[in-house]
Amino acid sequence: MAKKELERRSYAFEIRAEETDQGKIITGRPIVYNSRTDLGWFDEIIESGALDNTDLTDVRFLVNHDTSKIPLARSRRNTPNSTMQLTTDAMGMAIRVSLDTENNFEARNLYSAVERGDITGMSFMFSIDGEEWENLESDHPTRRITAIGTVVEVSACTFPAYDATEINARSKEALDSARLAVETARSAENKRSVETDLEVLRLKTMIKIKTGGIKNA
């Protein structure tokens, strides 16, 4: 079976720094249901329940998706002793990250940046198991994600929002991926349309043969 392509999404939903009896904590919500995001080539909405059967076996917590750095936390099967706790609810997904600020200077830097408001958003990397497209014939269709296959990584994000004013900050890779998604969906829709037309023609021909409209050779 072909490996599913991983995608990234970033949002400006609140991320917080808290000091508790258990130490320095980061909380946030990387995935929010029913929020429309403009990805350049199309709008995208993550539908309620898209996380119901998602694989959350091993999820890492990074800063700006930098995989060259050691993860600042990790959720392994979301066990109680994991340094990142994941919660799925009616709103989407929330996280609670326990940072080792005593032994990791990057964890200290992140905590300070979130506390000061220098880092204000969350991002996540995921694969898609189910999707529905609307208005594919338009210049700006909508994709509704109905099932997220797996989440492999969550990041604190410096540029959290894909607002129109920030479109130039998007990577070419991200825009190319969005364009390809639209083209693939349109191609699949056209193929289904052709197959439907052929099936209708076949049924009409069979009816004519049975009613004597066409003579068998």
Predicted regions: what is each one?
Residues 1-180, 186, 192:
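Signature of dsDNA virion morphogenesis modules
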Residues 171-217:
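Charged/polar low-complexity intrinsically disordered segments, enriched in acidic residues
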